[in-house]
Amino acid sequence: SVALHEALPGDYLQMARAAMLDLPAFRRQGWFDAYGEGWATYAESLGPQLGFFTDPFSRFGQLNEEMLRAARLVVDTGIHAMGWSRRQAIDYLNAHTANPPQDNEAEVDRYIAQPAQALGYKIGQLRIAALRERARAVLGARFDLRRFHDAVLGNGALPLDVLQRQVEGWIQAEKAAAKKGVQAPAPKATPAAPLPAAAATRRE
């Protein structure tokens, strides 16, 4: 899960792809948690297709990561909207994940210090997965997973509502191209300056 999330096809691929786009620097190097961490969390779900999670231990680790990202939705909301105490939040993570208690304590302290940041992982993953199913339903046999991924990554980091409009535009372009018997063009990418080193320091 960590390799898929942090490297390929997760954060590293997303940021490297953005750095190559023919966009202003602030767009190539921009960041939205729900998009970036959502993509990286979605990338973990591609593991079985890429030959990962073939043994019970790695599969268990992947499932625990899924549970943690889902539990964050409950705990962060509990702390910042429902009046939960730190102890309540830690107890919830201890009951609903396989993480060591000390890890869950650190997780909760993170949520307290950064309200809503950890929500982006699961929210972004769910939105990208929903867009994928939308594209598959509309395009049918025309749907190409690689081209869908390029549509998601092809404009750099975006707010989720903007991403949804971007993908919807791609779906319509694919439909129109299918009627003409041609392939819709992919977003243009050109070499660009590398990302700043700070981009690789976010904690998962």
Task: Specify the residue positions occupied by each region the protein language model found.
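N-terminal maturation segment of proteins
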Residues: 1-204
